[in-house]
Amino acid sequence: MNTYRTGLFSEFLARMYLRCHGFRIVKSRYITGRNTGRAEIDIIAKRRNLLIFVEVKHRPTLSDGWDAITARQSVRLRNAAENYIAKNAWRGDARFDVIVVCGWRIHWARGAI
Protein backbone atom coordinates (compact mmCIF):
# COMPACT_ATOMS: atom_id res chain seq x y z
CA MET A 1 0.00 0.00 0.00
CA ASN A 2 1.45 3.40 -0.95
CA THR A 3 1.66 6.33 1.46
CA TYR A 4 -1.38 8.12 0.01
CA ARG A 5 -3.60 5.07 0.50
CA THR A 6 -2.14 4.44 3.94
CA GLY A 7 -3.02 8.02 4.87
CA LEU A 8 -6.58 7.63 3.59
CA PHE A 9 -6.98 4.38 5.51
CA SER A 10 -5.63 6.00 8.69
CA GLU A 11 -8.16 8.82 8.28
CA PHE A 12 -10.92 6.21 7.86
CA LEU A 13 -9.82 4.48 11.09
CA ALA A 14 -9.73 7.83 12.89
CA ARG A 15 -13.27 8.68 11.72
CA MET A 16 -14.57 5.31 12.94
CA TYR A 17 -12.77 5.79 16.25
CA LEU A 18 -14.34 9.22 16.75
CA ARG A 19 -17.79 7.85 15.89
CA CYS A 20 -17.34 5.16 18.52
CA HIS A 21 -16.67 7.99 21.00
CA GLY A 22 -19.93 9.76 20.17
CA PHE A 23 -18.75 12.28 17.59
CA ARG A 24 -20.53 13.04 14.34
CA ILE A 25 -18.22 13.63 11.40
CA VAL A 26 -19.03 17.04 9.94
CA LYS A 27 -16.38 17.18 7.24
CA SER A 28 -13.43 15.17 6.00
CA ARG A 29 -10.48 16.72 4.20
CA TYR A 30 -11.60 20.33 4.53
CA ILE A 31 -9.37 22.44 2.28
CA THR A 32 -9.11 26.21 2.48
CA GLY A 33 -8.21 28.56 -0.34
CA ARG A 34 -5.36 30.91 -1.10
CA ASN A 35 -6.09 33.53 1.56
CA THR A 36 -5.36 31.12 4.41
CA GLY A 37 -2.12 29.67 3.07
CA ARG A 38 -3.90 26.61 1.66
CA ALA A 39 -4.35 24.14 4.48
CA GLU A 40 -6.21 20.90 4.90
CA ILE A 41 -7.96 19.74 8.04
CA ASP A 42 -8.23 15.96 7.97
CA ILE A 43 -11.40 15.65 10.08
CA ILE A 44 -13.91 18.07 11.56
CA ALA A 45 -16.20 16.38 14.09
CA LYS A 46 -18.91 17.53 16.48
CA ARG A 47 -20.36 16.30 19.76
CA ARG A 48 -22.95 18.45 21.50
CA ASN A 49 -21.46 21.95 21.76
CA LEU A 50 -17.88 20.92 20.90
CA LEU A 51 -16.29 21.07 17.47
CA ILE A 52 -12.93 19.34 17.04
CA PHE A 53 -10.40 19.80 14.27
CA VAL A 54 -8.33 16.65 13.91
CA GLU A 55 -4.96 16.12 12.26
CA VAL A 56 -4.32 12.44 11.49
CA LYS A 57 -0.82 11.00 11.16
CA HIS A 58 0.21 7.45 10.31
CA ARG A 59 3.68 6.67 11.57
CA PRO A 60 5.61 3.57 12.66
CA THR A 61 6.14 4.96 16.17
CA LEU A 62 4.18 7.36 18.33
CA SER A 63 7.07 9.82 18.68
CA ASP A 64 7.39 10.00 14.88
CA GLY A 65 3.72 11.02 14.76
CA TRP A 66 4.14 13.87 17.22
CA ASP A 67 7.31 15.06 15.48
CA ALA A 68 5.49 15.19 12.13
CA ILE A 69 3.43 18.22 13.19
CA THR A 70 5.52 21.34 12.65
CA ALA A 71 4.94 24.86 13.98
CA ARG A 72 4.19 26.04 10.45
CA GLN A 73 1.58 23.32 10.01
CA SER A 74 0.00 24.26 13.36
CA VAL A 75 -0.40 27.86 12.19
CA ARG A 76 -1.97 26.73 8.92
CA LEU A 77 -4.39 24.44 10.76
CA ARG A 78 -5.42 27.25 13.09
CA ASN A 79 -6.02 29.57 10.14
CA ALA A 80 -8.07 26.91 8.37
CA ALA A 81 -10.11 26.29 11.53
CA GLU A 82 -10.76 30.01 11.95
CA ASN A 83 -11.89 30.08 8.32
CA TYR A 84 -14.29 27.19 8.91
CA ILE A 85 -15.69 28.70 12.13
CA ALA A 86 -16.28 32.09 10.48
CA LYS A 87 -17.82 30.56 7.35
CA ASN A 88 -20.21 28.38 9.37
CA ALA A 89 -20.93 30.86 12.21
CA TRP A 90 -19.98 28.31 14.89
CA ARG A 91 -20.75 29.61 18.39
CA GLY A 92 -19.72 26.65 20.56
CA ASP A 93 -16.37 25.43 21.85
CA ALA A 94 -13.59 24.29 19.52
CA ARG A 95 -10.46 22.21 20.04
CA PHE A 96 -7.51 20.87 18.05
CA ASP A 97 -6.74 17.17 18.40
CA VAL A 98 -4.19 14.83 16.89
CA ILE A 99 -4.74 11.17 16.15
CA VAL A 100 -1.64 9.10 15.45
CA VAL A 101 -2.17 5.67 13.91
CA CYS A 102 0.67 3.21 14.57
CA GLY A 103 -0.19 -0.04 12.83
CA TRP A 104 -3.61 -0.89 14.27
CA ARG A 105 -3.17 1.20 17.42
CA ILE A 106 -4.84 4.59 17.65
CA HIS A 107 -3.49 7.32 19.94
CA TRP A 108 -5.76 10.32 20.48
CA ALA A 109 -4.30 13.50 21.96
CA ARG A 110 -7.01 15.98 22.90
CA GLY A 111 -6.09 19.66 22.74
CA ALA A 112 -2.72 18.83 21.24
CA ILE A 113 -2.22 21.75 18.86
Where are the regions a protein language model picked out?
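Acidic-basic catalytic patches of nuclease active cores, encompassing PD-(D/E)XK
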Residues: 1-30
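Domain-level recognition of nuclease-like catalytic cores that cleave nucleotide substrates
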Residues: 87-113
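Mg2+/Mn2+-dependent nuclease catalytic core
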Residues: 59-83
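Solvent-exposed beta-strand sheet faces enriched in polar/charged residues
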Residues: 29, 57, 97-99
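Short, conserved glycine- and acidic-residue-centered signature motifs
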Residues: 7, 11, 37, 69-73
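Conserved catalytic cores of phosphodiester-cleaving nucleases, focusing on short active-site segments
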Residues: 41-63, 77
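Active-site metal-binding core of divalent-cation-utilizing nuclease and nuclease-like domains
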Residues: 24-51
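Conserved protein kinase catalytic core
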Residues: 33, 61, 103
